[in-house]
Amino acid sequence: MTIRVGINGFGRIGRNYFRALLEQGADIEIVAVNDLGDTATTAHLLKYDTILGRLKAEVTHTADTITVDGHTIKVLSERNPADIPWGQLGVDIVIESTGIFTKKADAEKHIAGGAKKVLISAPAKDEDITIVMGVNQDKYDAAN
């Protein structure tokens, strides 16, 4: 079963998640990105990274999409996570990488938008659990 992912915040962390998921190639599909920047800049920053170098993929864009090696990703520009139509896009997991919505109540707004789960990339408050790979990843409960 393919896991459908949305990324909220496409700065350094969001783009790194994108690249990691793209390179992993497992049953993970990035279906949407929410960021306040325009798609031309978003596509350029994805393709040309000053730290990681050039993405070895063809990257093009339209007014509301980015296409990476033929796979089209919807680009949204919503300030309020509750307004992002994750459910309509079939998103299973949202990666919250803005650094803004780190409180559980704020991150849960993605659930209101239709996402099934939210992964917060920054230290969070009132979270269900903090997981550090290599330390306590065995504590993750997929049912929660």
Residues covered by each model-derived region:
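N-terminal Rossmann-like NAD(P) cofactor-binding subdomain of oxidoreductases
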Residues: 1-144
